[in-house]
């Protein structure tokens, strides 16, 4: 049985996915905004790292676990993006939207499996599944993961500085 805190964390996790989809939709509606698959990945990894911080999941541990499972190939083969074998047939944002849909489908399948097997369906496993699917998307789209995380950290740093400046201005 899951605690209320775990249920709230799962609710927040799925809310995060919805907010990613909403952010991408809003940017697509803005005529002045140019959006590519790369920006979609930055948005997603930014939200994922912020969620991890919020629920006290060590994002580095997720990265390490992924690296280890990638070496041993012992992880479950996430449906991921095998169905999106030719990424160039679609526009990048369309492909990324399909990737988010696949993440949701993978999470639903994992939740169903957990109900049958008694495995734990918690925020850590959800974060890992989403992370693994996003990394698989990076690999198939030939996007440098290190650059994405660098951009995420720069974004978070500049937002943190901006928030601090606003806070200082309000206190003066």
Describe these PLM feature segments.
Residues 9-22, 92-106:
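Short amphipathic alpha-helical heptad-repeat segments
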Residues 28-39, 63, 114-122, 142:
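Charged, low-complexity interaction regions
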Residues 3-31, 39-49:
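Short terminal alpha-helical segments
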Residues 5, 45, 51-54, 59, ...:
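Intrinsically disordered, low-complexity repeat/linker tracts enriched for polar/charged residues
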Residues 164-172:
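Short acidic DE-rich linear segments
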Residues 40-51, 96-99, 123-137, 141:
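An amphipathic alpha-helical micro-motif enriched in hydrophobic residues
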Residues 58-95, 110:
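Long, low-complexity or tandemly repetitive, helically biased scaffold regions used
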């Amino acid at each position: 049985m899951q605690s209320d805190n775990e249920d709230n964390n799962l609710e927040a996790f799925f809310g995060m996915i919805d907010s990613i989809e909403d952010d991408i939709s809003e940017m697509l509606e803005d005529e002045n905004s140019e959006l590519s698959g790369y920006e979609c990945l930055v948005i997603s990894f930014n939200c994922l790292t912020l969620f991890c911080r919020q629920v006290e999941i060590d994002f580095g541990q997720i990265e390490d676990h992924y690296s280890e499972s990638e070496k041993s190939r012992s992880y479950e083969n996430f449906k991921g993006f095998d169905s999106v074998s030719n990424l160039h047939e679609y526009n990048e944002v369309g492909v990324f939207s399909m990737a988010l849909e696949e993440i949701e489908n993978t999470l639903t399948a994992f939740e169903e499996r957990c109900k049958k097997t008694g495995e734990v369906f918690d925020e850590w496993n959800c974060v890992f599944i989403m992370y693994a699917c996003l990394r698989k998307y990076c690999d198939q789209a030939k996007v440098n993961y290190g650059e994405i995380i660098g951009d995420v950290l720069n974004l978070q740093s500049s937002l943190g500085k901006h928030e601090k400046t606003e806070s200082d201005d309000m206190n003066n």
